[in-house]
């Protein structure tokens, strides 16, 4: 049973624009999938179909086999946690503690369980000393962690992150990678919508490329990242490690700068050795 399944899904916006056009996509439980593409590609519109914020004009979206047309947003949100690009649009409570507690109360958790879950997530996401602070006073990175903590407090099976690296510095991106790794180790299904291919590359995820509401490609990251023509068509910048690998004639991108350095030094040494023979 797939965690997520889009079957011939199209969505026409109120202004008549076709935001999704014949989307067919199956994502298994425990899988990490990157959804990439330029502005207006349909990435966020696709995410909003996961918890019923939008319903397809045509076709079906199923979450663990259940048609989203047959469930409310509240019912779907219990299984699908969405973290949107702009944290300010997701935060509204007077304190970090009440922000996290809000969703848990809506889902009917006992007060004792709410207290326990709040303690767990604030410790894990580095928010323990901010419980009484107003969310709007937090930094960009702290707000993003709070949004993720708020969603993960009720332990949805699926987490979808919309442009999670926007406005984040290098260290916060590293922390975010650790969060994603932890979720995957627990068997969660994770979708990351992003144009930041450098951030995504260490995961080497299955990558779905979107453009003009359509799926342009669905393949392993190694193949997508070397296809400069596809990336150009999707309005994406080819990662530097992929550009270097392609220039050197490799059939896959380097995993990191250390691998690139070792490979180049090794090739150079090999040329010198052959020259001396």
Which ranges hold each PLM region?
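Conserved ABC transporter NBD signature motif
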Residues: 59-67, 76
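The feature captures the beta-strand-to-loop junction immediately N-terminal to the Walker
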Residues: 36-38
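H-loop/switch region of ABC-family ATPase nucleotide-binding domains
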Residues: 194-195
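Conserved ABC ATPase "signature" region
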Residues: 112-130
């Amino acid at each position: 049973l797939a965690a997520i399944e889009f079957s011939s899904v199209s969505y026409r916006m109120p202004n008549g624009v076709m935001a999704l056009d014949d989307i067919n996509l199956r994502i298994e439980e425990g899988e990490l999938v990157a959804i990439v593409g330029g502005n207006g590609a349909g990435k966020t519109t696709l995410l909003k179909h996961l918890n019923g914020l939008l319903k397809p004009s045509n076709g079906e979206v199923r979450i663990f086999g259940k048609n989203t047309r047959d469930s409310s947003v509240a019912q779907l949100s219990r299984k699908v946690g969405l973290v949107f690009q702009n944290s300010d649009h997701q935060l509204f409570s007077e304190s970090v503690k009440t922000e996290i507690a809000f969703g848990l109360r809506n889902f009917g958790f006992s007060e004792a369980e709410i207290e326990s879950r709040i303690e767990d997530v604030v410790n894990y996401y580095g928010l323990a000393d901010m419980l009484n602070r107003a969310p709007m006073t937090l930094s960009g990175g702290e707000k993003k962690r709070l949004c993720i903590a708020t969603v993960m407090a009720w332990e949805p099976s699926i987490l979808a992150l919309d442009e999670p690296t926007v406005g984040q510095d290098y260290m916060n991106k590293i922390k975010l990678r650790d969060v994603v790794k932890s979720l995957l180790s627990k068997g969660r299904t994770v979708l990351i919508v992003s144009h930041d291919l450098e951030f995504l590359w260490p995961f080497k995820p299955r990558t779905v490329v979107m453009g003009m509401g359509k799926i342009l490609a669905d393949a392993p990251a190694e193949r997508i990242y070397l296809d400069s023509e596809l990336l150009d068509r999707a309005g994406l910048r080819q990662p530097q490690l992929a550009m270097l690998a392609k220039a050197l004639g490799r059939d896959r991108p380097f995993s990191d700068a250390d691998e690139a350095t070792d490979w180049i030094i090794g090739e150079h040494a090999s040329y010198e050795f052959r020259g001396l023979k």
